[in-house]
Structures are given as structure tokens and as C-alpha cells.
Amino acid sequence: MTRREVLTLVPALGLAGCGYSLAGRGSFLPAYMQTIGIPIFGNTTPYQTVELLFTEKVRIEFQSRGQYTVIPVDTGVDGVVRGTISGISAAPVGFTDAQLARRFRFSIVVGVAFEDVKQQKRLWENPALNFADEYELASPSSIGLDASAFLGQERAAMDRMSSDFARTVVSAIMEAF
């Protein structure tokens, strides 16, 4: 074997045994954990139906991992994810020359926990996950805020945040961080 082959082979062998894996794809969950219940999250804010979007995104993210059956109830399951949306805010962060709001920061606070039903013990919890996204109005009018533009961009920001939230929560649960 040449020196070049040895220098190539040694690092490759070292990496083979290092336990490297993609972040967000590990699982510390017990082998018996096959069915995950994810009932609709609570919502203590005046924003109606936002809990449906966030709950659905968490369900989809768990299902995308491929090894769990996800159901919308907390009975007859091995583990359960519960959450409560406790705060939502939208605030202007950018303005036009006429001092009209052009860019908004939308944020949401969600408390979420994962419980092992069989062992009756909480495996992971974060009482105040905070997610934020900024969005710009496509064309603010010269007389003020265009409500339809605002609501359309708000929905898009909410959709992005709910996807980020779901990935973060499921990865944290799977890896117990």
C-alpha cells in the first residue's frame, strides 16, 4: 500500500466509527414508543384557529420521520405531545418615507411538552418556545395599511413559523435536547 493510500484510508476508517449522524434525525425514544398522540394545542390568544395550523405541522413532521403512527388524541398512545399557544404579536419594524408601516415582525410563544404515557413521565418540555418572522407588505398604499395585503403576508409568515416550530419541536423530542 502506498503512503498516499494509507493517508486516505486512515481518516476514512476514523470517521466510520465516530457515530456521525444527521442532526434532527436521531431518536432517543424507547423501542415501545410506536404511537404518538398529538391532540389539538390549546390557544389562549385572540387569534382563532392558529392552534390548528401549529398542531397539524407537528403531526406532519412526526409522520415524516416514518416510524411512528400519529393520532389526534391522547388515549391509547405510547407518547403524547401537548402544547398551548400563549402569545402572538405583530409589530411594525420598518417604515416608508411617509412613516407608514411597511415591514412587520410577527412572533408567537408556545409551551410544549412530550410525555411517555406508559412510564407516566415527562421526557421533554419547553414552556416558552418563541418563534418570529418578518414580512414586508408588497405595496403599502399612500393612505395607510392595506388590510388584505397585511393579512395575506401574516398568513404566509405564520405558515413559515409553524413549519420551523414543528421541525424544532420534533427534533428536540427525538434527540432529548
Residue ranges and their predicted role:
Residues 29-31, 76, 99-105, 160, ...:
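Short coil/turn motifs at beta-sheet boundaries
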Residues 27, 33-34, 38, 75, ...:
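Short capping/connector residues at structural and topological boundaries
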Residues 65-68, 82-153:
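Surface-exposed short loop/turn segments
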Residues 150-162:
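Individual transmembrane alpha-helices with interfacial aromatic-anchor signatures
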Residues 2-9, 14, 18-60, 67-72, ...:
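A structural "domain/chain start" motif
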Residues 15, 55, 99-102, 147, ...:
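Intrinsically disordered, low-complexity segments enriched in polar/charged residues with Gly/Pro
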Residues 74-83:
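Short beta-edge strand/loop motif at the mouth of beta-sheet-based domains
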